[in-house]
């Protein structure tokens, strides 16, 4: 299985220009430019002793980031694996810009209570990635990423360097939550399991692609409920906590009823449809490459 976010922003590589300089002969004492001559009769001067070259400064190579193990990938995605597909897509893309996450969270703290129009006006001139701007509509998610910068950065690196294993880990955890009876359709969300018809095998996968995948969508197209759950309980196995990850304020169990997955107030996303960071510009396509025409406007 080769899952894809259906909105990819590609960064170009800078070109390095090498500028050379032409050597010039030095003027003599009378200010005349000396000309090289193969038949010059001037006695050769005593060669200047060659000075030992100054050793070049040692270049310290930056070690490549270690590839997370399968167990580490489970631990890394456990807090967000049960998010609705479109929100998960935004979180993964935004995690590749941890500095922008911090800047946006700081802006919202300094300007609390912005209505939809004021929020859009504040976001439009910012040079942030569309995924980061989109999370402004989900302040609890944004704040969680901001207060756990080490986890956020690790999530972004894993998505950039090993997205296949990362997304396979998401599906493994979703399937385990389904098997435990905790992940299911509710008035807030629709959960659908589908069988993979065409299996794509990638050499060296740390997390084998599952035979089925689980989609999570809002029950109402324009109202999103962000799930709250304890990763140590909802999957039937405790994968531990990623170093530097801090749970939401108030823990995981305040006000829950009817299961291990709770929901707060619904977030209306209809007002954001016409903006490039709006909810419907994001999506997730499981089980293979995205269909033709998915492009930058997302796959629905």
Where are these regions (language model features)?
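Hydrophobic helical h-region of N-terminal Sec-dependent signal peptides
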Residues: 11-15, 269
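C-terminal motif of bacterial Sec signal peptides marking the signal peptidase cleavage site
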Residues: 20-23
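Mature N-terminal segment immediately following signal peptide/propeptide cleavage
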Residues: 65-91
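Mature extracellular/secreted ectodomains of secretory-pathway proteins
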Residues: 80-81, 87, 91-206
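Post-signal peptide N-terminal segment of mature Sec-exported envelope proteins
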Residues: 32-67
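Low-complexity, repeat-rich tail regions
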Residues: 25-27, 165-173, 178-300
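Bacterial N-terminal signal peptides that target proteins for export
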Residues: 2-11
């Amino acid at each position: 299985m080769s899952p894809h976010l259906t909105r990819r922003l590609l960064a170009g590589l800078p070109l390095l220009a090498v500028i050379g300089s032409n050597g010039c002969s030095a003027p003599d004492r009378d200010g005349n430019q000396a000309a090289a001559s193969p038949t010059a009769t001037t006695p050769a001067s005593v060669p200047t002793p060659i000075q030992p070259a100054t050793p070049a400064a040692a270049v310290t190579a930056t070690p490549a980031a270690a590839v997370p193990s399968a167990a580490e990938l489970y631990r890394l995605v456990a807090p967000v694996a049960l998010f609705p597909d479109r929100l998960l897509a935004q979180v993964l893309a935004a995690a590749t810009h941890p500095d922008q996450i911090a800047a946006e969270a700081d802006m919202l703290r300094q300007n609390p209570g912005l209505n939809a129009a004021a929020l859009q006006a504040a976001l439009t001139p910012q040079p942030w990635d569309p995924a980061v701007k989109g999370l402004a509509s989900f302040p609890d998610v944004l704040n969680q990423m901001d207060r756990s910068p080490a986890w956020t950065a690790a999530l972004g690196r894993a998505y950039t360097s090993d997205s296949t294993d990362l997304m396979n880990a998401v599906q493994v955890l979703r399937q385990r939550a389904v098997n435990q009876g905790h992940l299911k359709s509710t008035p807030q969300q629709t959960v659908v399991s589908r069988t993979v018809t065409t299996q794509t095998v990638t050499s060296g996968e740390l997390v084998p692609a599952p035979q089925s995948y689980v989609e999570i969508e809002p029950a109402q197209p324009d109202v999103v409920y962000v799930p709250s759950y304890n990763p140590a309980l909802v999957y039937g196995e405790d994968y531990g906590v990623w170093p530097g990850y801090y749970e939401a304020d108030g823990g995981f169990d305040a006000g829950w009823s009817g299961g291990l997955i709770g929901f707060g107030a619904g977030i209306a996303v209809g007002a954001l449809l016409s903006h490039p960071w709006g909810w419907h510009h994001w999506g997730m396509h499981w089980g293979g490459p995205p269909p033709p025409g998915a492009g930058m406007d997302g796959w629905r």
